[in-house]
Curated annotation (Swiss-Prot):
HAMAP family: UPF0304 (MF_00762). Belongs to the UPF0304 family. It comes from Pectobacterium atrosepticum (strain SCRI 1043 / ATCC BAA-672). Coiled coil: none annotated. This is UPF0304 protein ECA3037. It comes from the Bacteria.
Length: 164
């Protein structure tokens, strides 16, 4: 992240104020203030992640993934014959914090701030799947979107989606 000295000074002052306004996170803000003031390039890359951007298309895809998981859970609940389907495989795991942090942040925003999908279990890791999920979810989405009745899935359709 490239910043002028004036921009670094402004951001440093913002972090200084945040240490006073949010004492619970003061250490984090002091650390960021030091990084900005001293211009540590490697650590300043962390800010790139915090100030990242997700396109509208990516946001819609993530919402579709979450909606697909909702549909899987609804369909499973309505099934009379569950045919050895393991309910745990229908759980929305989230995204990998290490490689898909922006996607994970959007999921947390949707659930905790926007109040969408409150029935999703964040688990002990807060939707951190701890493995890359984007490609898996896009394969699952392709199968789900080809189903004629997306919220009334059969056991076979559910199995096809989760095995995609």
């Amino acid at each position: 992240m490239e910043m002028t000295n004036a921009q670094r000074l402004i951001l440093s002052n913002q972090y200084k104020m945040m240490t006073m306004l949010d004492p619970d996170n003061a250490e984090r803000y002091r650390r960021l203030q030091t990084i900005i003031e001293r211009g540590y390039g490697l650590q300043m890359r962390e800010l790139d992640r915090e100030f990242g951007e997700l396109t509208e298309e990516v946001c819609r895809t993530i919402i579709n993934v979450m909606e697909m998981h909702h549909a899987l859970q609804v369909s499973w609940t309505n099934l009379k014959d569950k045919q050895d389907l393991d309910e745990r495989r229908l759980t929305f795991l989230g995204f990998d914090a290490a490689t898909e942090a922006r996607y994970l942040g959007f999921v947390r925003f949707m659930v905790h701030v926007e109040g969408r999908y409150p029935h999703f279990d964040a688990g002990t890791h807060g939707f951190n799947a701890q493995t890359k999920m984007w490609e898996k979810y896009t394969r699952m989405l392709a199968v789900w979107q080809s189903c004629p009745r997306q919220y009334h899935l059969s056991a076979v359709e559910i199995a096809q989606i989760i095995n995609a």
